[in-house]
Curated annotation (Swiss-Prot):
Disulphide-bridged cysteine pairs: none
Enzyme Commission (EC) number: 1.3.5.2
GO CC terms of this entry: cytoplasm; plasma membrane
Free-text comment on the cofactor: Binds 1 FMN per subunit.
Catalytic center residues: 173 (nucleophile)
Name recorded for this polypeptide: Dihydroorotate dehydrogenase (quinone)
Lineage top rank: taxon: Bacteria
Residue numbers binding substrate: 66, 111-115, 170, 175, 244-245
Species for this entry: Rhizobium rhizogenes (strain K84 / ATCC BAA-868)
Length: 362
């Protein structure tokens, strides 16, 4: 049923501009029009990462459910976890439209949304009534006009502490001017110190410690990766998400849309993001949790991220082309791949192709 929905839905949605289509997909999930997917609870896929119990390693990346409108509906598609946001303290409209572009030949997407969202309070109101064991992460960012961006991240930690299962500090979007400057070593040190101090303060009050991840860009030099790894380890951060969208346009077939400004995601970013993932795994060692994201379109590509060093994986853009049945197919496909590999846990395959990916150039 989901397969036929995918084919009909894609044809219909692709007649619309991408942002309108996205809004309609959110509305469909809200109204229950999208069929749910019952994935088997394969114990081999279960992971304990950063103290959280994931039924399977596949998550919905931030960017789809910016305003926490459909986290529970997304979990019913087969995802083991989902991440809302990016949310900023104040509502902001983002950049002018058009700001999302499909690269159909490449199965990629370029966006220059600019953290458009309804702000902390709107997302918090939607998250507070949610009950259940589903893992919902909160991706936090800074307002475009903020005079103190680090304070915006601290505000996100404090505001969502009662509802987040984990936090992601997003400092890697290319669509907010100057945001990626927070990846520079001195700025990153100040950010991590402030964010983790706020987390520890809230943890002392709440009696629970919520893990904090850092989402980084794929457009990093070797020196830049060295600096990030050093600061992450020095501050005892809980984990990394590798990676956000890229500014690179290497190898694209659609040279017309490729000229649009913004971050590229989907299948074209798989290789670059996986190389950076492996290089970061090599730098931070075996213990630090890493979530791999970028170009995951199948069980095979999800497993390749894990082989390159990821504990968990996320997807988003490839669902634009594959439809809402994709997470269920990926999870079922991972079980079949584990049958073939004859392993008791998917964790046994982590890092099995680390050197292959880490030795490649970005």
């Amino acid at each position: 049923m989901i397969g036929s929905f995918r084919d009909l839905g894609r044809r219909g949605l692709f007649l619309l501009d991408p942002e309108t289509a996205h809004g309609m997909s959110i509305a469909a999930l809200k109204s229950g029009l999208v069929p749910t997917c019952r994935v088997s609870n394969d114990p081999r896929l279960r992971q304990i990462v950063a103290g959280l119990d994931f039924a399977n390693p596949l998550g919905m990346a931030a960017g789809y459910d910016k305003n926490a409108e459909v986290p529970e509906a997304l979990l019913k598609l087969g995802f083991g976890f989902t991440e809302i946001g990016t949310v900023t303290p104040k509502p902001q409209p983002g950049n002018p439209r058009p700001r999302i572009f499909r690269l159909v030949e490449d199965e990629g997407v370029i966006n220059r949304l600019g953290f458009n969202n309804e702000g902390h309070e709107a997302a918090l109101r939607r998250l507070q009534p949610i009950r259940g064991n589903g893992i919902i992460g909160v991706n936090i960012g800074a307002n475009k006009d903020s005079a103190d961006r680090i304070a915006d991240y601290v505000a996100g930690i404090r505001r969502f502490y009662s509802v987040a299962r984990y936090f992601t500090a997003n400092i890697s979007s290319p669509n907010t001017p100057g945001l990626r400057d927070l990846q520079a070593r001195e700025s990153l040190s100040a950010l991590l110190s402030a964010v983790l101090a706020a987390r520890d303060d809230e943890a002392a009050k709440a009696g629970k410690k919520i893990p904090v991840f850092l989402k980084i860009a794929p457009d990093l030099t070797e020196e830049g990766m060295d600096d990030i790894a050093a600061e992450v380890l020095a501050h005892a951060l809980d984990g990394l998400i590798v990676s956000n969208t890229t500014l690179s346009r290497d190898g694209l077939k659609d040279q017309v849309q490729a000229k649009e400004a913004g971050g590229l995601s989907g299948k074209p970013v798989f290789e670059r993001s996986t190389v950076v993932l492996a290089k970061m795994r090599r730098r931070v060692g075996a213990a630090l949790p890493i979530i791999g994201v970028g170009g995951v379109s199948s069980a095979e590509t999800a497993l390749e991220k894990i082989r390159a060093g990821a504990d968990l994986v996320q997807l988003y853009s490839c669902m634009v082309y594959e439809g809402p049945g994709l997470p269920g197919r990926v999870v079922a496909g991972l079980s079949k791949l584990l049958d073939r590999e004859r392993v008791a846990s998917i964790r046994e395959l982590r890092d099995s192709r680390l050197d292959y990916w880490a030795d490649r150039k970005v």
